[in-house]
Amino acid sequence: MKKVLALVVAAAMGLSSAAFAAETATPAKTAAPAKTTQTTQHHKKQHKKTVEQKAQAAKKHQKKGGKAPAKTTSKPTTQPAA
């Protein structure tokens, strides 16, 4: 753990000294930064297709099984004459 801490401290010291050296090595006069032209992009609005609500409601309330159930025909039961 101590070795890791020592490496971190050494790296920080090395970076700070490198930054200090680079800062002092630059000439006193600095050139003005070049102008950058900024272009703005205009995005067109996309019109979404309107969805009919009626169609969705009709789907919800639609009966399942499109055909009516077939009626079963059975012979009427006759009671024997008493």
From Swiss-Prot:
Propeptide residues per the UniProt entry: 22-56
This protein's UniProt keywords: Periplasm, Signal
Low complexity bias (residue ranges): 22-40, 67-82
Major site of localization recorded for this protein: periplasm
Sequence segments annotated as region (Disordered): 22-82
Alphabetical list of InterPro entries matching this protein: Acid_shock (IPR023497)
Record keyword Isomerase present: no
Domain of life: Bacteria
Signal peptide extent: 1-21
Post-translational modification note: Proteolytic processing gives rise to the active protein.
Pfam families: Asr
Compartmental location: Periplasm
One Gene Ontology term, aspect cellular component: periplasmic space
Basic residues bias spans: 57-66
Entry annotated with the keyword Zinc: no
Intrachain S-S bonds: none
Family per record: Belongs to the Asr family.
Function, in words: Required for growth and/or survival at acidic conditions.
Family matches, as HAMAP family: Asr
The protein, known as: Acid shock protein
Organism for this UniProt entry: Salmonella typhimurium (strain LT2 / SGSC1412 / ATCC 700720)
Gene: asr
